[in-house]
Design a protein with these regions (language model features):
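Polar/charged alpha-helical tracts
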Residues: 57, 61, 137, 141, ...
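Long, leucine/valine-rich, helix-dominated scaffolding and oligomerization segments
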Residues: 166-170, 185-188
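Extended, well-ordered alpha-helical segments in internal regulatory regions
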Residues: 175-198
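Non-transmembrane amphipathic alpha-helical segments
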Residues: 146-160, 185-192
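Short, small-residue-biased leader/transition segments that mark boundaries at the very start
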Residues: 2-5, 193-258
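Structured mid-domain segments that build the active-site/substrate or prosthetic-cofactor binding neighborhood
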Residues: 1-152, 156
C-alpha cells in the first residue's frame, strides 16, 4: 500500500473510563496528532485545565511521582519502553488470594499463573528466585514512595480552588492513598506468611491497612458514582471485602494459637 494508506495504531488497555481519565485523554490527544504529541505538554495543559494554572506544575510532578511509585517488578523487555512492567492492584489481589488459600504451608515461590494465562509467568512477572522475598523488598520500597506522594496530595488539597478539589481527590489523591495503604497491607500479610513470630501482630496491621485502602477507594463514591464499586465482589475484581474476611479468619486462627 502507498503512504496514503498508512495509519498510526494505538493500543489502549484501560479498566474503565472514570479511573483513567487522564491516561485516556492523553491517548485521544496522541491519536488526534501523533507527530505533534508531546507528553509533557499534554500533561501541563491537562493540569492547567483541571487544577488551575497556579498549581499545574505541582500537580504534574505529583502525577509523575505517583506512577513511579508503583513497584517495577521486572525490567523492560522493549528498548525505550519505560516501566513496561508494574505491579498493579489486581496483582496485589491475586497475591492475597493465592497465599491466603495456602497460608499454613510456606513456600518461597507460592504464586502460580492464573488458569487462563497463555504466556508462562505473565500473571505476576516477578523476577528473582524467591517470590516472597522479592515481594517484601518491593513492597517496602513502594509503600514509602506512595506515602510521600500521598502526603503531598494532602498538603496541596486545601490550596486548590474549591472547584478543582473533587477531581483532584478522585483522580489522584485517593488512588495514591489507596495504593499506599494497599502496599503496607500486603507487606504485613507477607511478613505474617513467612515469619511465625508476631504473626498475629502483622495480620492485624495488614487488616488495618486494607481497611484504610478500602476507605480511600470507596471515598470516591459520590453523586452518580455512589454505587461505583458495588460490583467489586464479581469475578476478576479486587473484592476487598472478601480479602478482609480472609484476613479476619487467619488472624482469629493464629491469634488463638499464640495466646
Amino acid at each position: 500500500l502507498g503512504d496514503v494508506y498508512k495509519r498510526q495504531l494505538s493500543v489502549v488497555n484501560a479498566g474503565n473510563l472514570r479511573e483513567f481519565v487522564m491516561e485516556l485523554s492523553a491517548n485521544a490527544s496522541m491519536m488526534w496528532d501523533m507527530t505533534a504529541y508531546d507528553t509533557d505538554e499534554f500533561l501541563y495543559d491537562f493540569c492547567v485545565q483541571y487544577f488551575g494554572e497556579n498549581h499545574a506544575e505541582e500537580v504534574m510532578q505529583l502525577y509523575r511521582d505517583y506512577y513511579h511509585a508503583y513497584w517495577e517488578q521486572k525490567n523492560a523487555e522493549f528498548p525505550g519502553l519505560e516501566r513496561q512492567f508494574i505491579f498493579h492492584d489486581l496483582r496485589y489481589a491475586r497475591v492475597f488470594k493465592q497465599i491466603g488459600e495456602r497460608f499454613e504451608h510456606f513456600s518461597p515461590n507460592p504464586l502460580k499463573d492464573i488458569v487462563r494465562e497463555r504466556v508462562p509467568g505473565r500473571s505476576f512477572r516477578i523476577e528473582g528466585s524467591n517470590q516472597v522475598d522479592s515481594l517484601l523488598s518491593g513492597m517496602e520500597r513502594t509503600f514509602g514512595k506512595f506515602d510521600k506522594v500521598a502526603q503531598r496530595c494532602t498538603e496541596l488539597m486545601p490550596r486548590l480552588l474549591e472547584q478543582y478539589r473533587c477531581f483532584f481527590r478522585d483522580n489522584l489523591s485517593a488512588p495514591c492513598h489507596y495504593m499506599a495503604a494497599l502496599s503496607h497491607s500486603l507487606y504485613h500479610f507477607l511478613w505474617a506468611y513467612k515469619y511465625i513470630e508476631r504473626r498475629t501482630e502483622h495480620l492485624n496491621l495488614s487488616i488495618e491497612y486494607l481497611e484504610k485502602a478500602q476507605e480511600m477507594l470507596y471515598s470516591t463514591q459520590h453523586g452518580v458514582f455512589t454505587d461505583w464499586y458495588v460490583g467489586d465482589s464479581l469475578h476478576g475484581k479486587f473484592n476487598i471485602p472478601a480479602k478482609l474476611k480472609q484476613l479476619y479468619k487467619l488472624r482469629d486462627r493464629y491469634g488463638k494459637t499464640e495466646m
